[in-house]
Amino acid sequence: MIRITERYIETEQTPVIAGVISLTYDERKRGRLRAKTQSGEDVGLFLERGKTLLDGDLLMAENGDIYTISAAPETVATAQANDPRQFAQICYHLGNRHTPLQIGELWVRFQPDHVLEDLCRLYGLDVVRESAPFNPENGAYGGHSGHSGHSGHSGHHHGHDHSHEQSRQDAKELSARYHFHAPDHEHPHGHVHLHAHPHEH
């Protein structure tokens, strides 16, 4: 197994790439990981914890070889907005949940979550689940990646309970505007379901 122990500091000279390592977002948050290159070589990552690897990052192995990181396709939820105002609203509310977000041209992408997907639909966005590379914004959230001794899912779970409560509050606040009713109970699986009922005026 090839041991990869440090990030490569780029110089003016273009490095020779020995291999490409494709990793999902949760895998890129981990400092210790066994993986394979796209050509099938076994590699082990032994890196400083707490810094999420980004698509295109270069790493150096103990033998001096340079490897590049590629964001692997994974299941994601992509929400498409119809106009800039709608887009700004959903970015604001999703941002309040401290969830990793990839932001595009009037679309946002996040890890699958029924609560967040329902919230996007509540604001009128079209939501689809698809397979695509996930490259969230590397802002303040990046400093929280990978707590010591936790699995790669710890960062996502940390804000999940909070998103449930926030979604219930949002549903109540928006019920008059969008004619949605939010039930006071929770279903066994813990997700809030927003039921729309037609109103006569």
UniProtKB/Swiss-Prot annotation:
Biological-process GO terms, alphabetical: protein folding; protein-containing complex assembly; urea metabolic process
GO cellular component, one term: cytoplasm
UniProt xrefs under InterPro entries: UreE, UreE_C_dom, UreE_N, UreE_N_sf
Keywords: Chaperone, Cytoplasm, Nickel, Nickel insertion
Main location: cytoplasm
Comp. bias regions, Basic residues: 190-201
Region described as Disordered: 136-173, 182-201
CDD domains xrefs: UreE (cd00571)
Subcellular location: Cytoplasm
A GO MF term: nickel cation binding
Biased composition (Basic and acidic residues): 162-173
Pfam families reported for this sequence: UreE_C (PF05194), UreE_N (PF02814)
Function: Involved in urease metallocenter assembly. Binds nickel. Probably functions as a nickel donor during metallocenter assembly.
Matches recorded under NCBIfam families: PRK13261.1-1
Family classification: Belongs to the UreE family.
Name assigned to this protein: Urease accessory protein UreE
Organism: Hahella chejuensis (strain KCTC 2396)
Lineage: Bacteria, Pseudomonadati, Pseudomonadota, Gammaproteobacteria, Oceanospirillales
